[in-house]
Structure formats: C-alpha cells, structure tokens
C-alpha cells in the first residue's frame, strides 16, 4: 500500500498533528486506544496508509512526534488520544529552542536529529511501499522552523525519491507571536524551496477569519483552527485511503500542481464551511462546493487569489459525487474566470473523486491552488526581514549559535528570487514570452545552442 509517514515538529506542528490524528481516526473507526470499532469494511480497507497494524488488531499511527521541550508532547500523551501513539515515537529534548531558528537547526535540534531519524527510519522500514512524508510545523518559532527544516533536508538526503509535503504555518500579518518571526520564516523558506515537493501555506489569521466570519464562532480557539487544517489534510489523502472513481496520490498532486520546481507553495481551502445553525438551509451540490472552495474568503493563507493568477489548481471531492458534474464545474470555473488563470497552461484544474465522505458530511471538497498571489506572504515577511536585518537587530541570538550573516543574506535573496519568479510567470502571456521562457527555463546550454542543437551536433 502507499504508506505516508507523518512527522510533527514543535508546539504548533504537534497541536495540528494531534487534531489531524483525531479526525483521521474517526474516519477509519479507530478509537483512542487504537482498537477498531467502525461500521464499514471500507474503513479498514486501506487504513495502513496512515496506520500500522500492531498485535491484537491494534492500529498505531505512523507518526513521529518531535519537540525540543517536553511540555506539548506530555500534554498529548496525557490527553484523550495519548494511548493511540507508539510511546517510543515521542522524541523530546529538554532545553527548548526559544523561538530561535539557529538553535533548532544547528545546535539543540542537531543534537536530537539523529534519534528522530532513527524513529523515522524504523517507521519507513515498516512500510510496504512508502509513498512519502508529511510534516506539520510552523515557520515562526524555533523548533518547527529550525528543526523542522533540518529534518526535511536530512530525510530528503536519505529518501531522495519519496515525496515530501509540508503543512507550514506562516507568520500572520496582524497577529505576531514573536518579534523574530521574519528571520525564522525567511530562513525556513530558504530550506523549503530546495528540499520540499509541496508546501501547503496556512496562517492563523486567515483561519481566525474563517472561524469568526464563516463559522460564526465568537471566540475561535486553536482546536477550532486546527480542525480546519486537518479537514484539508484528510481530504488530500482521501483517495489513497478510500476507493474512488478518480484517484490521486502525493506524486500525482505534485506532477499536476508544480509547473516549475521552485514554485511549490500552495494555498489551501475546504468546503462546505457554514455556521452550525445554517447548515440545514444550504444545498450541498458540486456547484455549491466549487463556488465556496474557490472563494477568496475560504483560503487558509492570508493572500487574495484575485491579486494574482492561478498557475494550476486541484480539487478533491468526497462523497457520492458525479464525476461528469465535477468535470463540468472545473471547466466552468476556468471559462468563467479565465482572467484568473494563466493562459499558457490549458486545463489547469485537476479533480479527484473519492466515494467516502468525511464523518458527519454527505459531501465535501478540499482545494489546493498554486497561485502567484502567494507572493503576498513572501513580500510581507521579506519587508519585515529587511527592516530588521538592515539594523542587524536581534542578530546576535543567531550568530551566537554559530550562524553567519552570509546565511541571512542568501536566504533573503532566495526569497526575493522566488517572488520575482512568481511575478515573471504571472505577467507571461502565450505569444510574447515564448523565447524568454526558453531562456528562463535554462534551455540555453553553451553559448546559444539549445539542447536539440547540441544533440544534433
């Protein structure tokens, strides 16, 4: 089976991860002790994508839980689902990273990374046919960003041909937890551009807005926010875990969504989202779900897709959905909003259909968009980064852990390059840019000989 090993790093990553395992366990009819008490054979049919079957029919998540301080992991262990996880898959340091990327990446995290990799290796060896890894972490703190990216690059080294997907919580525009977020985030993006296959960008402020405005929760708490994210996480892998008419997996996802290797930062959305009292009054149709998931208010990252253009997009429908209707809706979206899509990638929306709806729903859809509007996040973080880096503010915390200023400069220019690539492809049109594209894509090898000329010669 196509197994996925899940890694959660740092406080934010562990809280999202814990919620994700609650949601997935409920879908597969697995209770908090790992025993199966579901109602349908389909629930167990491919449960091994995320679970290992232990002795006595117990299902154990393929999860590795990592943090540089024991607090959050202890809370998960003591919580209602603590008995679900394998006890030796918890790897905790004692000192914490103190919101310092350098501590997570070079000092404290580097000391712990080998013991984490041992657990990851053991989980990977327990798989028949490992599909890839998914990492949940935040980019603003120390452990999730510093140690999370260290793990991503180490796993990349050891498993170069497996998929690497990360669910990365970006710093929010208005809500800032720590003053050094721009540093941590920029240094992390620098790593993720090189080592990840797909990065799903999430931010707390967008999640707050969805909870507050759409779900009408007056005081959203982190569990509410994390539930939104886990809905998408479960939707993306649903067709690996349940039978469907149009299947998808992590590799198909990347092949269909990443037109250029560096542009793998996606925004995600989920439908149906409606306040508790309103649900009964809404029709759930494919058209309704499609409309909602393409709605800018539905995006879980704080950037407006109307400010850019979609390179590609992917929709994951669940429930009893007509494939024909899905195809028609995808076509209609592209025809109606043609200005929002790049014209030199025809049929840019991929759809997948899974027959089993999530718990408590008759139909749902998860959305992934590769839009040039994602540059808003990088621009925002970049401007905060330059403002502080110009004055070398807070830099001694990083250089004290052995980092060099050069690394900051490199990370900054890598992120700026990413923004200018996004701008270049947004502005490109079919006619005018063909020659320029050939040059941009590195088709010019020596002098002005193209690949074809070279081989012909």
Swiss-Prot record:
InterPro entries: Beta-tubulin_BS (IPR013838), Beta_tubulin (IPR002453), Tub_FtsZ_C (IPR008280), Tubulin (IPR000217), Tubulin/FtsZ-like_C (IPR037103), Tubulin/FtsZ_2-layer-sand-dom (IPR018316), Tubulin/FtsZ_GTPase_sf (IPR036525), Tubulin_C (IPR023123)
A GO biological-process term: microtubule-based process
One CC-aspect GO term: cytoplasm
Residues the entry annotates as binding Mg(2+): 69
Positions of the UniProt region annotated as Disordered: 431-457
Function: Tubulin is the major constituent of microtubules, a cylinder consisting of laterally associated linear protofilaments composed of alpha- and beta-tubulin heterodimers. Microtubules grow by the addition of GTP-tubulin dimers to the microtubule end, where a stabilizing cap forms. Below the cap, tubulin dimers are in GDP-bound state, owing to GTPase activity of alpha-tubulin.
Complexes and interactors: Dimer of alpha and beta chains. A typical microtubule is a hollow water-filled tube with an outer diameter of 25 nm and an inner diameter of 15 nM. Alpha-beta heterodimers associate head-to-tail to form protofilaments running lengthwise along the microtubule wall with the beta-tubulin subunit facing the microtubule plus end conferring a structural polarity. Microtubules usually have 13 protofilaments but different protofilament numbers can be found in some organisms and specialized cells.
Annotated family: Belongs to the tubulin family.
Protein name: Tubulin beta chain
Gene that produces this protein: TUBB1
């Amino acid at each position: 089976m196509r197994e996925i090993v899940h890694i959660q790093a740092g406080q934010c990553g562990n809280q999202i991860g814990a919620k994700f395992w609650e949601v997935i366990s409920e879908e597969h009819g697995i209770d908090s002790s790992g025993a199966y008490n579901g109602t349908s054979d389909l629930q167990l049919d491919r449960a091994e994508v995320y679970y290992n079957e232990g002795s006595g029919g117990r299902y154990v998540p393929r999860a590795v839980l990592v943090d540089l301080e024991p607090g959050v992991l202890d809370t998960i262990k003591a919580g209602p689902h603590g008995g679900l996880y394998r006890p030796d898959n918890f790897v905790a340091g004692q000192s914490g990273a103190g919101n310092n990327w350098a501590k997570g990446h070079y000092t404290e995290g580097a000391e712990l990374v080998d013991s984490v990799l041992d657990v990851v290796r053991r989980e990977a060896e327990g798989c028949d046919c490992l599909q890839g890894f998914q990492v949940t972490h935040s980019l603003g703190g120390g452990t999730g960003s510093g140690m999370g990216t260290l793990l991503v690059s180490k796993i990349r080294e050891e498993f170069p041909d497996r998929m690497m997907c990360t669910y990365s919580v970006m710093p929010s525009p208005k809500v800032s937890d720590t003053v050094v977020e721009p540093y941590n985030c920029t240094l992390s993006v620098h790593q993720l551009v090189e080592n990840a296959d797909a990065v799903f960008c999430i931010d707390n402020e967008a999640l707050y807005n969805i909870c507050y405005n759409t779900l009408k929760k007056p005081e959203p708490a982190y569990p509410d926010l994390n539930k939104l994210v886990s809905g998408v996480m479960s939707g993306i892998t649903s067709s690996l875990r349940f039978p469907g008419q149009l299947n998808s997996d992590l590799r198909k996802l990347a092949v269909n969504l990443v037109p250029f290797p560096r542009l793998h930062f996606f925004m995600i959305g989920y439908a149906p989202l409606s306040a508790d009292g309103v649900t009964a009054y809404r029709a759930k149709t494919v058209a309704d779900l499609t409309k909602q998931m393409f709605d800018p208010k539905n995006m879980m990252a704080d950037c407006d897709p109307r400010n850019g253009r979609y390179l590609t997009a992917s929709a994951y429908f669940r429930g009893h959905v007509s494939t024909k209707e899905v195809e028609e809706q995808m076509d209609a979206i592209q025809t109606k909003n043609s200005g929002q899509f790049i014209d030199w990638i025809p049929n840019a929306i991929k759809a997948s259909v899974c027959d089993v709806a999530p718990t408590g729903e008759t139909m749902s859809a998860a959305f992934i968009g590769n839009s040039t509007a994602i540059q808003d996040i990088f621009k925002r973080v970049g401007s905060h980064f330059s403002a502080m880096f110009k004055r070398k503010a807070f830099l001694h915390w990083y250089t004290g852990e052995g980092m060099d200023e050069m690394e900051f400069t490199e990370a900054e220019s890598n992120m700026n390059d990413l923004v200018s690539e996004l701008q270049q492809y947004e502005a490109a049109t079919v006619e005018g840019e063909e020659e320029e594209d050939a040059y941009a894509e590195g088709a010019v090898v020596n002098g002005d000989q193209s690949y074809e000329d070279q081989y012909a010669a």
